[in-house]
């Protein structure tokens, strides 16, 4: 007999001993759509990167220069937004549906205000950013344009991320997955016409003139921005029109409450700080890589895209772990929270171990998807094979952190990530890059990910992450 997350939460609140097969079924029900979403989204990102990569290594390097800055800004905003979805999961687990809808409404106001402010900041700094990062003069114009256009779409990016996470908190992983896939398909379509100029193509033996704007890197940014605008609007439309515990049409207040603000500060501030710490370290790493030449910059950027083949499953399971643990904590069932955490973490490690093998075996072919530059392919394949050994422990850190965040332990996650990234990866990269180049940077990354996974497993085993309890 199948069981939904809502039914499982009701049984947890009643104190029932839920069989392991039911918890595993719910975990798989939430994980599989999220994993499939990550697979499709990653495939679309591969196509997206390949469309830019075939313009040339300089185009790829232009985006690679500012990619860590997009991670920094987006990561901080995503951390704050995640605090709202964690509250929703715990309130639904406690059967406090009106409180959950109140949090949703407050998140909408937050997204609008903070998203517009962040967009203005990003556009305002885009002119100077590539220079601050040490980019070659020839790369700066395209890098600035890409960052400015991407920043302008931040309100929609925040909306899609926040509302999709809230839908998953209700046990619906399919709808946000479909929205994400549709958004990625739109991204490819928009990029096809915006990146390339008008050209002749042969389709089924017929010569056709295909229209295009030929905007190159700025066209890639605009295509992504337009797709995100559609995705964010669709996610909001689902919450407006579809019946369910989070339906905005149901009774609820639009007032900002002290409890919600307290919880956002308690959970969201450490999450934002964590993302800032990780992403700012990435900015410094890009600064290190930018001094290694255009080939290294392109190989590093495309290598990161190729590696996402491995960790996409981990992040899919992390989404499920956050919702499951959040509802278990809300239902005051520490035993179920632990079960979900270990079950999901084991799934993440196992799947990422398998994809790590694939990454090692097919590294040259993966790099060949993105670029035809032989030097970039050779260097990228070499560093990917180093990274493949870290994938199981990377999976442990991804899913375990999602479990802890679902319980409200964002401070613990922040400290572990800070120590690992700044104490291990950056230190080793500074020491190894001058002698070993990009290979040294990725050796540092591999060592750090293994360390991070061990730290998260140790904290999860000690159980102190559950002491945070349910939110106010």
Regions found by a protein language model. Give the residues of each.
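Helix-terminus/linker motif at the lipid-water interface of multi-pass membrane proteins
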Residues: 39-61, 130-137, 193-198, 207, ...
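Small-residue-rich hydrophobic transmembrane alpha-helices
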Residues: 60-120, 157-176, 286, 299-363, ...
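Interfacial/gating helices of multi-pass transporter permease domains
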Residues: 51-71, 137-145, 217-222, 259-267, ...
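Transmembrane helical elements of multi-pass membrane transporters/channels
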Residues: 29-48, 149, 160, 227-231, ...
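Alpha-helical transmembrane segments of multipass membrane proteins
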Residues: 46-50, 128, 162-166, 188-193, ...
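Short alpha-helical transmembrane segments in multi-pass integral membrane proteins
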Residues: 1-34, 88-155, 186, 202-269, ...
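N-terminal transmembrane alpha-helices
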Residues: 18-50, 54-55, 68-87, 112-119, ...
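Residue-level hotspots within the lipid-embedded alpha helices of multi-pass solute transporters
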Residues: 38-39, 75, 115, 119, ...
């Amino acid at each position: 007999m199948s069981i939904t997350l809502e039914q499982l939460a009701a049984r947890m609140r009643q104190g029932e001993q839920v069989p392991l097969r039911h918890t595993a079924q719910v975990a798989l029900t939430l994980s599989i759509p999220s994993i499939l979403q990550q697979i499709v989204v990653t495939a679309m990102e591969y196509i997206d990167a390949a469309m830019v990569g075939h313009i040339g290594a300089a185009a790829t390097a232009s985006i690679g220069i500012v990619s860590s800055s997009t991670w920094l800004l987006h990561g901080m905003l995503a951390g704050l937004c995640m605090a709202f979805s964690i509250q929703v999961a715990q309130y639904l687990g406690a059967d406090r549906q009106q409180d959950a809808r109140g949090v949703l409404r407050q998140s909408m106001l937050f997204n609008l205000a903070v998203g517009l402010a962040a967009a203005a900041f990003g556009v305002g700094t885009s002119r100077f950013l590539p220079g601050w990062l040490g980019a070659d003069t020839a790369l700066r114009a395209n890098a600035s344009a890409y960052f400015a256009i991407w920043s302008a779409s931040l309100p929609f990016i925040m909306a899609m991320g926040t509302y999709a996470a809230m839908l998953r908190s209700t046990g619906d992983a399919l709808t946000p997955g479909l929205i994400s896939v549709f958004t990625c398909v739109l991204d490819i379509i928009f990029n096809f016409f915006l990146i390339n100029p008008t050209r002749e193509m042969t389709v089924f033996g017929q010569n056709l003139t295909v229209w295009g704007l030929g905007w190159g890197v700025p066209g890639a940014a605009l295509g992504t921005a337009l797709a995100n605008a559609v995705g964010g609007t669709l996610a909001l439309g689902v919450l407006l029109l579809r019946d369910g515990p989070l339906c905005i049409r149901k009774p609820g207040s639009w007032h900002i409450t002290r409890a919600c603000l307290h919880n956002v500060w308690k959970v969201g501030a450490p999450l934002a700080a964590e993302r800032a710490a990780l992403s700012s370290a990435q900015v410094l790493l890009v600064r290190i890589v930018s001094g290694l030449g255009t080939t290294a910059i392109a190989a590093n950027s495309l290598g990161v895209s190729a590696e996402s083949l491995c960790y996409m499953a981990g992040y899919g399971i992390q989404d499920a772990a956050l919702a499951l643990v959040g509802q278990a904590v809300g239902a005051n069932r520490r035993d179920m929270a632990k079960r979900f955490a270990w079950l999901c973490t084991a799934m993440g490690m196992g799947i990422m171990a398998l994809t790590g093998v694939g990454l090692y075996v097919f590294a040259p072919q993966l790099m060949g998807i993105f670029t035809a530059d032989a030097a970039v392919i050779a260097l990228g394949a070499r560093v990917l094979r180093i990274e493949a050994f870290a994938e199981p422990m990377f999976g442990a850190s991804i899913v375990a952190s999602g479990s802890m965040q679902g319980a409200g332990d964002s401070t613990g996650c922040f400290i572990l990530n800070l120590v690992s990234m700044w104490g291990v990866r950056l230190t080793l990269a500074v020491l190894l890059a001058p002698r070993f180049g990009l290979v040294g940077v990725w050796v540092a990354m591999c060592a750090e990910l293994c360390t991070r996974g061990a730290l998260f497993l140790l904290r999860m085993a000690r159980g102190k992450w559950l002491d945070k309890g349910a939110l106010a």
